[in-house]
Amino acid sequence: MSQSPKVGFVSLGCPKALVDSEQIITQLRAEGYEISGSYDGADLVVVNTCGFIDEAVQESLDAIGEALTENGKVIVTGCLGAKSSASGSNLIEEVHPKVLAVTGPHAVGEVMQAVHSHLPKPHDPFVDLVPAAGIKLTPRHYAYLKISEGCNHRCTFCIIPSMRGDLVSRPVAEVMLEAENLFKSGVKELLVISQDTSAYGVDVKYRTGFWNGKPIKTRMTDLVAALGELAAQYGAWVRLHYVYPYPSVDEVIPLMAEGAFKGHVLPYLDVPFQHAHPEVLKRMKRPANAEKVLERVQKWREICPDLTIRSTFIAGFPGETEEQFETLLDFIREAELDRVGCFAYSPVEGATANDLDGALPDEVREERRARFMEVAEEVSANRMQRKVGKTLKVLIDEVSAEGGIGRTAADAPEIDGVVYVEPAAKASKRYKVGDFVSVKITGADGHDLWGEV
């Protein structure tokens, strides 16, 4: 029997791109290809790229160059694959003309066609059964669940719609089947992602689907309720990311706070507010009423006191005045957001914000970002201190002789903080990766917690 062909894989970018990579690798394995852990052991290499900001573009171009140098046979996919150069030609083909093929994002079929052209699939392979959950690039105990592709918004700083297109929602039964397979495979935390989670179903007019004989609308609230019910059967968590602040978000908060879903639909919202001043938000083409946002945040916390709110912001957007930036700082202090990230505005090729007047010098943008983070970290530290002395449920991510590292319901993997857990003193309290344990919090800083089982 001939040896199975081997494909190397490089995955860059956000969790949405990671899911694309998982789907491609799942298909490769289903067709009998092996995945190589090195360039020299691969017959060709697939590079899944990111093209959102300049740093990501350069990282992707460098990765393609490295793969060409080390292997020589490279297929490129992902967001950067859809990007044109200043001359109008494909950017990747212009910089790296020796690549075998280039596709855009969410293009499993096109990638497989390119692989078949340059590395025919085995005719008589002994194919391992691919698990129903597919091939995952995350640890076994958590996984990303992508519910839609694309975005209908046209934020002036963003080029995602030009690369991934308008919103296309996955059928609700398909999403639920994938979620069930993931839970069956041992996943303890499901992270729901998309470009715009709140808009799920808008493109199909909230069409009714069916799962296990029950009708479920293709709508965020209905999907979250169904996922919460399913997660409860497996003692698992569901976490929501990329939740655009539509009014419909208000309907999800009670699912986090009460009834059968409490403890399974996590009291956690990742809501990208981006700014707080109405004029800046208007220039960004974002919802523009900070006072209403504050009212909503207060109402959310009244309904669900344990709610954690994560958000991202942009400092130094074109035309932002010092007064407008101070409004943003006041908003951060008053809203008391738990987890906050901030980017100094950086022009992205193809974004309409590049045409706005009032571009700020690099040093002003960076200085405002630093001031923003100073305020945000102070707010975060105060909120973290309130957890000292409490006993929290923690999902263990790592275990060593020094103890464990895990996360609470308030912490998404890779972007939020962690809990450093002391080694278990008794055999009955020992834990392993993927376990839920009760941890008494003994210390905190602005980002992480410390505790003991």
From Swiss-Prot:
Residues annotated as domain MTTase N-terminal: 5-120
Sequence positions that bind [4Fe-4S] cluster 2: 151, 155, 158
Residues at which [4Fe-4S] cluster 1 binds: 14, 50, 79
Enzyme class, first EC level, given as a word: transferase
Record keyword Hydrolase present: no
Domain of life: Bacteria
Residue span, TRAM domain: 385-453
Protein name: Ribosomal protein uS12 methylthiotransferase RimO
